[in-house]
Structures are given as C-alpha cells and as structure tokens.
Regions:
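Residues that define the transmembrane beta-barrel architecture of outer-membrane proteins
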Residues: 64-70, 104-110, 141-149, 183-191, ...
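Short loop/turn motifs that connect adjacent beta-strands in outer-membrane beta-barrel proteins
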Residues: 31-41, 77-83, 119-128, 153-169, ...
C-alpha cells in the first residue's frame, strides 16, 4: 500500500522594506515686532478767487474788493508727541495797487503752530498739549508769539449716537504782540475755550471763546481825544457746518458744503475797536475813525465741492460758492449791508 507523501511548504522569506526618515521643514511663527513711529501728515495747496461783492465797488464803497488768495497749509507729525502746523496765505490784488480807486487785498500772512502732547494728566482722561504759535499779519506786518497750555476734557462729555464731543479744550495763555513801531506792542493774558461737536446727517457745531486782558505799550484811542492803557476783551466764534454728499463713485465725489455763523463777535470794556470813516483819508488821524466796544460779523457760505481721487494719497478739488456777510458795517448797534461775494477755489491735498 502506497503511503502519501507529506508536503512541507517551503519557507517564505519576507524582505523588510528599508525605513526612510523624512525630515520636514518646521516653520516657527513669531509675532512680528511693531514698526517704529513714522513721520506723517498732509500738504494742502489751493488758490481762492474772491469776486466783487454786490454793490461794494468804487462807485458805492470807494474801493474795489475783488482779489485772489494762494494758501499753503499742512501738518507734520514729527514724533508721537510733536507736531508742526503751518499756514501761509498770500493775497494778490486783482486791481492796480497804485490806483486808489481799485485797491484790493494784498500782502502775505504766516501762521506757524508747534504742538507737544504731554499725555493725560495723572490718572485722568484729560489730555494736556502745549501749543506755541507765531503769526505775522498781511496788511500791517504786525507779529505775535503765543503760548497755550491746552487741557482737553472731551472724554468726559457727550459720546452717543446723537452728539459726540470731539474737543472741549480750556487753554490758559500768554501772548506778546508787536508792530513796526517799537512802542506799539501788547502783553495779553487770558483763557480760551475751544469746542467741537458732531451730529447726525453731516452736521457739526464749533463754539469758541477768547478772553484777553490787554496791557498796551502804546495808549489806544477810544475817541478822537481819549486814550486808555488797559482793556478787557471777549471774542466769540460760533460756526455751524454741514456736508451732504450729492454724488460719489470710485474716483469722484460731489458734495454740498455749508458753513456760517458769528465770525466773530467782539466785546471790549473800552471803545478800542475803530473803523475808518474814509479809507482814502489819513489813517493816522484819530478823527477819521468811529470807536466802538462791540462789533460782530455774521456770514453764510454755501458751496458745491468736487473732489477727484488721483490716488489713495492724492486728491484734487474745486469748489464754487458765495459768501453772504455784513461787509460794510460791523458795529453791533447798526450792523447792516449784508452782501453776497462769489468765490471759486481750486487745489490739491496729499497725505504722507
């Protein structure tokens, strides 16, 4: 009897695959260090033309008043705490300056302001900023230098959907004023109030008070034969602003802009505010003036402003408008002769 053979399976050899070690790049994310302060600011250059105010010409007022004004203004934030503002206005007479019948505005006005932000006072939310201002007037070449300690209490006032206070500053000050005559100088001590409030629908309201105690180096006339050495003055400014967009796209904006109000109202303890009776007469003759203790100017200035965005940091603009103001008589008791004066503006603004 045949026996079955036992079949023994052959051994299976299993080859182990080689182990590969793959090193992956490990990216370590670190917080980016904040960049240091970079100086920034803006530059605005414009030309403004003032047309003849209605009826205020040589025939009716003895002098034409159409002129142009080139204005260069801007701000440089030099450090986190320091800033410089500048405004230079150069007036050019559109008439013949040698002809008294066609005399307009002329000269250059310069204003420079340096700010130093000291931060909040103690643990309060009151900001303290020092401001030094230098100013040179266009007509008389009079100059002034002023220091203010500006305490801003805006964080303690309104901040809701209806009204937001962006500035409420109380500023003690000292000012030194001097003219070409060595005796014609003034020392002024006082306190100013600056406020700004924003409202819905593009409205805002600015209200300012300037309180001054004047100490004159040269006695000031209060009529044709009386003079004073000291005076107390209070000046009020009140402006209403509104900006309403009429059309906009990626490049163009057309806005209706309005501003108006008291610009300014002046009160004095002495009648040192004088107005020439005859602008072509002797301006050094005290009998050629009327003297008042209160004056005011009120105005309204609607405009249409068109802005073209050349780039994110460069805009050009133009506006047409007219200013309504009591040009001829600003005496509080007899203010009158409100007249329209057309204006046109073209300019550009760049930020950096």
């Amino acid at each position: 009897m045949a026996q079955a053979k036992e079949i023994v399976p052959a051994p299976v050899v299993v080859e182990e695959a080689p182990v590969q070690v793959v090193e992956k790049e490990v990216i370590v994310y670190r917080d980016r260090e904040p960049q240091g302060f970079r100086p920034n600011g803006y530059v605005d250059l414009q030309y403004r033309y003032y047309g003849e105010a209605e009826e205020l010409n040589y025939k009716n007022n003895g002098v034409s008043n159409n002129y142009g004004r080139t204005q260069l203004m801007g701000r440089i934030n030099m450090t986190e705490n320091q800033a410089l503002e500048y405004r230079i206005r150069s007036y050019n007479d559109w008439n013949s300056s040698s002809n008294d019948k066609q005399k307009g505005e002329d000269g250059t006005q310069t204003r420079l302001r340096y700010f130093y932000n000291h931060g909040n006072v103690g643990d309060s939310s009151v900001n303290l900023t020092s401001r030094i201002e230098y100013r040179k007037e266009a007509e008389s070449d009079a100059q002034s230098l002023e220091y203010q300690a500006r305490f801003n209490f805006a964080d303690y006032l309104f901040n809701n959907d209806f009204v937001k206070t962006t500035e409420f500053t109380i500023a003690p000050k000292y000012k030194y004023y001097w003219a070409s005559n060595s005796d014609d100088y003034q020392n002024r001590l006082g306190v100013d109030l600056f406020t700004m409030h924003q409202f819905p629908f593009g409205f805002s309201f600015e209200f300012n008070l300037y309180g001054d105690q004047y100490f004159y180096g040269q006695r000031q006339y209060t009529n044709d034969h009386s003079t004073v050495k000291n005076n107390t003055g209070l000046t009020m400014e009140a402006y209403l602003y509104n900006t309403t967009n009429l059309y906009t796209n990626d490049k163009f904006d057309i806005d209706f802009y309005f501003e108006g109000g008291y610009d300014p109202y002046n009160w004095n303890s002495e009648k040192v505010l004088k107005t020439a009776i005859n602008e072509k007469g002797d301006l050094n003759d005290p009998t050629n003036y009327t003297y008042n203790d209160n004056t005011y100017e009120w105005y309204a200035y609607p405009q249409i402003i068109t802005t073209y965005k050349v780039s994110p940091n460069f805009n050009v603009y133009a506006s047409l408008g007219a200013e309504y103001r009591n040009w001829a008589n600003i005496n509080q008791k007899s203010a009158k002769d409100w007249r329209w004066q057309p204006t046109a503006v073209i300019g550009f603004k760049t930020t950096f």
